[in-house]
Design a protein with these regions (language model features):
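Cytosolic nucleotide-utilizing catalytic cores of signal-transduction proteins
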Residues: 14-249
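Catalytic NTP-binding/metal-coordinating core of nucleotidyl cyclase/transferase enzymes
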Residues: 1-11
Length: 249
């Protein structure tokens, strides 16, 4: 971990030293690197481009290490040294609170949550998922949910977008199984927001979908068996007299 952090710190210095007046890079809490840039306003566009390139370079670099992903949080610009502590806190907020652990992209700090998730971007995956739910195939559902989350990761969705996608998959399952009236959006929202990682969210959605399929299948089988069971009961109640050979004779 320390090796990776030192390498990231070095890459930060290489990326920004040529266009800054001062640059301070430091490892924070053994899990992040903090970079403070002092530059002329005329370099703003150059800095923005370098931040984007820096994020992409780190993403490629960390692909060589299992279980490592990069999150970059960028604060708004400040114009006086008295505001530096504010900028640092803003960058922490941008990196830590706006994105799930282990996922991310370069983002500006802002107070409003991002909710850019669009089901249209997952149309093909949804059609396969809906087919798996409709035919009540738990393993196929699990596979399609994994596909949705992989696509979401490739798109580097924001945390709130992952939440929205998980809620959408659950709501869709209720709709397809025709049990939408039992879907409690507030309860599900609260449960989802208590999950801290993408893996936790994905696994929860899989478990819930598979459980709903299991319950719906059982209920459907009971409905299909009910007429048969009622017929058996009727036969037992009305045709229980035994006919012996003597009676026949």
């Amino acid at each position: 971990m320390q090796f990776v952090l030192r390498k990231i710190m070095q890459k930060a210095e290489d990326a920004f030293s040529a266009c800054t007046i001062d640059l301070i890079a430091a490892v924070q809490s053994n899990h992040s690197v903090q970079v403070l840039l002092n530059y002329f306003q005329t370099e703003q566009e150059n800095i923005d481009n370098r931040i984007t390139d820096f994020f992409n370079e780190l993403s490629d670099y960390l692909e060589n290490f299992q279980h490592y992903r990069i999150t970059v949080g960028v604060s708004s610009e400040v114009e006086s040294f008295e505001q530096i502590s504010t900028a640092i806190e803003m960058s922490k907020e941008a990196a830590a609170s706006r994105l799930f652990k282990g996922n991310g992209r370069r983002i500006e700090y802002c107070q409003e949550p991002h909710t850019l998730f669009s089901p249209k971007d997952f149309q093909n995956e949804y059609e396969e998922f809906a087919k798996a739910v409709e035919t009540m195939q738990p393993d196929a559902c699990q596979y399609q949910i994994h596909k949705c989350f992989r696509l979401a990761s490739d798109k580097a969705l924001f945390a709130s977008e992952f939440y929205a996608m998980g809620l959408w998959l659950l709501r869709s399952t209720y709709d397809i199984l025709e049990i939408a009236d039992t879907f409690d959006v507030d309860v599900q929202q609260e449960v989802l927001e208590n999950l801290s990682t993408v893996a936790d969210l994905r696994d929860y959605v899989i478990r819930q979908v598979q459980q709903l399929i299991k319950e719906s299948r059982s209920e459907r089988e009971n409905r299909e068996r009910k007429p048969v069971l009622e017929a058996i009961v009727y036969m037992k109640e009305h045709f229980t007299e035994k006919i012996t050979l003597e009676d026949v004779a």
